[in-house]
Amino acid sequence: MKYQKLENQEAHWKWLYLIKKHREGENITRYEERSLSEDKVKQLLSQQNQPQAIENWIKAHLSPHLMIKLDQAIRARRKRFFNGEKQSTKKKSIDLEYAVWLRLSRYSRKMKMTLSETITYMIDERESKAQYEHQISAMKAGLKDLLK
């Protein structure tokens, strides 16, 4: 396993996920009867700061169709949590106008690169062009001095 499991943290994430699903109107329990389902959700709500109780509630009452979704959500959250710790793996975002993004995307596909690689390539090319222009202007100035 690439990422360390933090039991207390993950129990809190599971609690947040399940409460969010409940508030969106989804039945998070395995019970069809509304009153029984509501009782179990109230029980879960009262267990917010009890990681072991949350895990026990999930084992006993979670809807089977939510089990896989919950595991996937926690796995993704764990990855984002650990990747967010290091500057090198933390996701960054930039604002691009749609037309700019479209051009960059087409250019990336043409170059068979990712968007990040394409941006780095374009910056490197621009820097080398500026360095080349500086060398040419220095040579021109040197030639003018020689011809005087």
From Swiss-Prot:
Q: Which cysteines are joined by disulfide bonds?
A: none
Keywords from the named record: Cell cycle, Cell division, Cytoplasm, DNA-binding
Name its cellular compartments: Cytoplasm
State the superkingdom. Answer: Bacteria
Kindly give the InterPro entries that the UniProt entry links to this protein.
Arc_rbn_hlx_hlx (IPR013321), MatP (IPR009390), MatP_C (IPR035375), MatP_N (IPR035087), MatP_N_sf (IPR038339)
What binding partners and quaternary form does the record give?
Homodimer.
This protein's name: Macrodomain Ter protein
Q: What gene codes for this chain?
A: matP
